[in-house]
Amino acid sequence: SSRLIWVIDPLDGTTNFSNGLPSFCCSIALVEDGEPVVGAIYMPWPETTEGRIIHARKGGGAWEGGVRLQIAPGNKPVSGRVVVRGGFLPGRFRPNKDLLANGGQQRSIGSTASELAMVADGTYQYTLHGNPHSWDVAAGIILVREAGGTTLSHNKKGWYPLTTFKDNTLGGTQEAITQETLRHWQSPVLSGNPEMVGFVSDNLLPLPLSTRLLRGTKKALKLSRSNRNP
């Protein structure tokens, strides 16, 4: 174990990249005692030859070039403005009528780290990712926080602030976080400004485990049948 660990995803959005789609990025974060304290995300961008680099450090703000970034305002999603709700949503949570009526316009680009960077720059109102790895979100967590936002994760007790990867590992009781701990970390992640995130999390109802297992079994059976009958 070490107090300082680099968490790097050299290519987030691999499927996009391999299919010639320009929605991918490189994500680098420095984690201190489980907490992301420095982060940078590089994204290719159609209007530039250099692409975009969004970066942040703890207490220093989130920046792109010389411009300090600010997260999108608002206490609930606005129709016509984009959000990300991962494809996992029907399998783990059920949005209530308030969220269905005020959910925003769903637009996922297939790169979790890129989407978090665009929460930080105010493009996305919020993002909700189903089961990302630590390397998908480590840089994005510090970018969102330093742009004035917040990030939540979810466990069996409900939503909680995701400030350190210790929060969702071994009950948060271990003395030091390790590379192995980070390698196996996965959890739902909700990001946006504090009021927006509060509205979304309050209106997402977790499905009972029995319902999730039943849906998972049905999905597996359907996949098995399709494989037998191409």
Predicted feature residues:
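Short, isolated positions in well-ordered beta-strands
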Residues: V37, L69-I71, W159
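Short helix-loop capping/hinge motifs at secondary-structure junctions, enriched
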Residues: G61-E64, R68-Q70, M196-F199
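Short loop->beta-strand "edge-of-pocket" segments that line small-molecule binding or catalytic clefts
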Residues: W63, Q70-R92, N96-G110
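Conserved S/T- and glycine-rich ATP-binding loop of Class I adenylate-forming
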Residues: G13-T14, V82, V144
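Oxyanion/phosphate-interacting regions
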Residues: L100, S114-P230
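DPxDG-like acidic metal-binding loop motif
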Residues: S2-G59, W63
